[in-house]
Amino acid sequence: MKKKSLLILLVMCSIIFITTGTFAYYRYSVNGSIIGKTGNYTFNVTSNSTTTKDINLGSNLKPFDKGSFNLTVKLDNTDCDAYYTLKIEKTNLPKGFKFLSQDDNISPFSTHSKYFDGGDNKTDTVTIYWYWDGNVDDEDDNSFIGKTISANIVINSKQTNPAYMKNGYSEDENANGGTEFWNNTYKPYVRTITFDNNLSNLPSTCNEENLCWDISYSQTQNKKVYGYLVDSGLTIEETDSSTSTTVNKSLYNLYIVSEAQTFAPNDSSFIFSFYKYENSKYISNLISINFNNNFNTSNVTSMSGMFYYCEKLTDLDISNFNTAKVIRMSKMFSFCLKLTSLDLSSFNTSNVTDMNAMFYNCVYLTNLDLSDFNTSNVTDMSAMFNGCLSLTNLDLSNFNTSNVTDMEFMFWGCSSLASLDLSNFDTAKVNSMYATFYDCRSLTNLDLSDFNTSNVASMDRMFADCTSLSNLDLSDFNTSNVTNMDRMFADCTSLTNLDLSDFNTSNVTNMFGMFYKCDKLQTEITITGTSITNYANMFSNALTDVNAYVIINYSSEAESIAQGMKSTAPTSNQSKITLKQI
C-alpha cells in the first residue's frame, strides 16, 4: 500500500512539473540548433520619415537558436545631407532573446546610425545578429517555443546638415579650464544641462555679454550649435581667494541647442566635467543632464573623463549613447560620487582599449551590470572599480581580459564585495597587480587558481587589508618575474592558510611588511638567492595567534636574509618561525 501511494505521489509531482515548466533547466527537449541567416531586407525610405516593419526571424525557434539578417537602407530621394537611425523594439519576445552587433552572443545591438553627405550614394547595409539565450530563466519561454518570432524594425530618417558641437574643455593651465562656458568662470556654477532643438529662447544677440556662445565645431557648417546660460535664481556661498571674503555665486542652467540633432565631437573627453579645483577644494554644482535624444555620439572615439567629478549627479540616462566607435573610456564616471545606479546595457564596447579608472570612486554604486560588455580589446583595467565601496555584487563572468596588461588597483576599496568570481580571467599579459584587491575587506574567499602571473612584476599590496580572507591558495602563482612583494598580505588579520609552496622569490627585491599584522598566519615560503634587499617589518605585529607559524626554507646564500626576516617578528613570537636550509 505504501509503494502504491508513493507511486501516485511521484506521478502527481511529474504532472505538476510538466504542466508548469517554469524552470530554466526544463528546456531539456528544446535546445536550439538553428544557425543561419534569416534573409536580406531593403528599405527605401524618404527623408523626414519613420518607417516600421516586422521581420520574420523564423518559426519553430527554440532556446539557444541563433542567426542573423541583413538590412539595406536607401535614402536616394534627396541631394541634401541626410541621416537615419535604426533600432529594434523588443516587444513580445522571450526574456533571453538578444539582438547583437557582433556574432559573439555578447555585444548588444542598441541603435545604428548612418550619416550621408549630400553627394553620397545614400545606401547602407547593416548585419544584425540574434541569439536566444537559453540560460536566462524565463517562465514564459514555453509560450514562444516552436512559434514564429519577429523583430520590429523602426527606421527614422531625416534630411539635415550635421550640427556638430565643439569641446571647449582644456587641460592647459593657462586656459582657465577651457573656452566659452567650459571656462572656470562659468562651468563650476552650472546646475543643469539640457539639450534641445528649440532656438526660440536663444538670446537675440549671441555673445558672452548675454552668456551665449556659438559652439559649432566648424564656423562653416550650415547647422549651428549654441550654448547659453540662464540664471537659475539659486546661489551658493564661496570664499573669494583674492580677498578672503564670502561672496554669493549665481548658479546657471545651461542649454545646448541647434535646429538639428547635436552631434558630439570625436574627442568628447571631459566635455561634461564641470568642476574646478581651487584652494585645495573641488567645486562642482551640476545635478542633472537631460540629453532629450539630441546628443548624437555615433562618431565619438574618446569618452575619457566625460563625466569626471560630476559629484552631485544622482541620475544619468545615457541609454541612447552610441559607443560603437569609442576607443577610450578611462575616468568616464570617476568621482560621480552620488550615482547609485548606471544602465550601460546598450553600450557597445567592442573597440574600447582603455577602461582605466572608469568607475573610480563611484562610492554609492551598489550594483553594476556589465554582462554585455565586450572587453576583448581592452588593455588597461587599472583602478577600474577603485573606491566603489558600496558595490555588493559584480558579475564579470563575461569579461575577456586576454589583452589586459594592467590590473593595478582594479578592485582597491571595494570593501562591500563579499564574493568575486574571476575564474574566467585570462591574465597572461598582465604585468602589474599592484594593490589589485587592496582593502577588499568583505571578501571571505578568492579563487585565483586560474590566474597566469608569469609576466607580473609587481604584487605590491596585492591583498593588503583583505581582513576577512581566511584561506588563500596561491600554489599556482608563477612569481618568477616578480620583483616587488611590498606589504603583499599586510593587515590580512584573518588569514590562516596561505599556500606559497611554489613561490619563486629569486628576483624579488622588496618584501617590506609582507606579512604585517597577519596574526593567524600558517604558511611556508622559500627564499633563494640574495636579491632581497628590503625585508624590514616583514613579520611586524604578526603571528600573535597561538596556532600561528611560519617555515622559511632558504638556500645557503640566503641564510643571513632568512635570519633577518625572522628578527622582524615580535620577540615573543620569533619562536613561531622555523628556518630550514634547503
Task: Tell what function each PLM region has.
Residues 2-62, 145-147, 154-162:
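Short, polar/proline-rich extracytoplasmic segments that appear immediately after membrane translocation
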Residues 161-582:
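Negatively charged
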Residues 38, 57-66, 109-111, 116-123:
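Solvent-exposed, conformationally flexible loop/turn segments
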Residues 37-39, 44-48, 58, 74-76, ...:
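A structural detector for beta-sheet-dominated domains
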Residues 35-37, 44, 60, 72-74, ...:
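Generic structural detector for well-ordered beta-strands
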Residues 65-82, 121-162, 268, 515:
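C-terminal, structured domain-capping segment
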Residues 109, 124-130, 250-255:
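Strand-loop-strand motifs at the edges of beta-sheets in extracellular beta-sandwich domains
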Residues 17-18, 27, 61-108:
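Surface-exposed interaction patch
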